[in-house]
Structure formats: structure tokens, C-alpha cells
Design a protein with these regions (language model features):
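OB-fold nucleic-acid-binding modules
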Residues: 1-23, 98
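Residue-level marker of beta-strand positions
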Residues: 19, 71-73
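Short beta-strand segments
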Residues: 20-22, 47-51, 88
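Short, surface-exposed secondary-structure boundary micro-motifs
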Residues: 25, 77-78
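Short solvent-exposed strand-capping/beta-turn motif centered on an Asx-Ser/Thr pair
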Residues: 29-31
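OB-fold (S1/OB) nucleic-acid-binding surfaces
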Residues: 35-55
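Extended, charge-rich, solvent-exposed interface segments
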Residues: 56-71, 79-158
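Conserved small/polar residues in nucleotide/adenosyl-binding loops
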Residues: 164-170
């Protein structure tokens, strides 16, 4: 059964030493001779989950070549790491690529200018900047709606008015 990364971080003690299944996109991949690290994000949480994979996996050489943006399905055991930078990590028992990503995928693990992100508007939601902006806007909108609802206001969603719906006089 799928577990969201947000759940793993929120209830890490409950998931300790248990097998979980996650789906997400590779943010980074650092491979070494005997093991490697994938940072995977599923969009449910700002933080990425570090996945540790080792040479015991039959597709180790394939995993070590996964690029940024590849979609994956991973099964593994959650290990708490209180002395490390991250609170927990996932030790992979299987890693499966669901969708490849082209070599020229524009969103790489580096800082991008806002001008560049305007050019790839369909991908900017996958960046940390826009992920944070969307989360803040969501919380702010919810707070505003709750305030007005609790004070007896009615929310009316009016249709947009555009000039294509209006009849304009013709000038001769």
C-alpha cells in the first residue's frame, strides 16, 4: 500500500523498521561502487526522502543511472537516523522505474532564476521555490475562507466576465 512521504516524516516512530511503498520523482542520485542515494519527492511534503540502495539489488547498475525527473516506485524498510541531517531514510528492497526522463530535462538540482522558470512554466511546480509558494498560498487562502465563514459571510464564486461575451457596437 502506498505511503506518502509526508506521513513518513509526520509519524516516523510508527514507521520505524517497517516496510513501506512510495511513489515519486528522483530529485538527485548519488551512486558509488557498492551503494547509492536517491532523493525522492512525491509532492506531499516539502522535504525529499533519502533512499539508500545497494549492490545487492539486481538492477543496481540501472538505478545508479537514474536521472533527475525519473518517476519511481520503491519498496523498503524505514530506518530512523536521529544523528544524521535527515530524520529518517528508506533502505530499498526494490526500485522500479515507472517513467524515464530525457537527458535535457530542464529542472536540475541547482538554483534556477525566476526568468528561466517562466520559460518552463509547466515544470516549475517541481521546484522548491514554487512548492513553497503554493503551500503558503494554500494555507493563506484557507485561513481567509475560514475567517469569513466563521463571521457569517457567504462565499460566492462568480463567473469571469470577458469581452468575448459582450456585444460591442461596431464603429463605421
Amino acid at each position: 500500500m502506498r505511503t506518502k512521504i509526508k506521513q513518513l516524516f509526520a509519524k516516523s516512530a510508527e514507521y520505524a523498521d517497517k516496510e513501506v511503498e512510495i511513489y515519486g520523482w528522483v530529485r538527485t542520485n548519488r551512486a558509488q561502487a557498492q551503494f547509492g542515494f536517491l532523493n525522492v519527492n512525491d509532492g506531499s511534503f516539502f522535504e525529499s526522502l533519502q533512499v539508500v540502495y545497494d549492490s545487492a539489488l539486481e538492477n543496481f547498475s540501472d538505478i545508479s543511472k537514474y536521472r533527475v525527473g525519473v518517476s519511481v516506485h520503491i519498496k523498503g524498510i524505514v530506518k530512523l537516523t536521529p544523528d544524521m541531517k535527515q530524520a529518517l531514510e528508506l533502505h530499498a528492497s526494490s526500485v522500479e522505474m515507472l517513467g524515464d526522463c530525457p537527458e535535457d530535462y530542464p529542472i536540475q538540482p541547482k538554483r534556477h532564476t525566476r526568468e528561466f522558470l517562466r520559460e518552463v512554466a509547466h515544470l516549475r511546480a517541481r521546484t522548491n521555490l514554487f512548492s513553497a509558494v503554493f503551500r503558503i498560498r494554500s494555507v493563506a487562502a484557507q485561513a481567509i475562507h475560514e475567517y469569513f465563514q466563521s463571521n457569517g459571510y457567504l462565499y460566492v464564486h462568480t463567473p469571469p466576465v470577458s469581452y468575448t461575451h459582450l456585444t460591442l457596437p461596431t464603429i463605421r
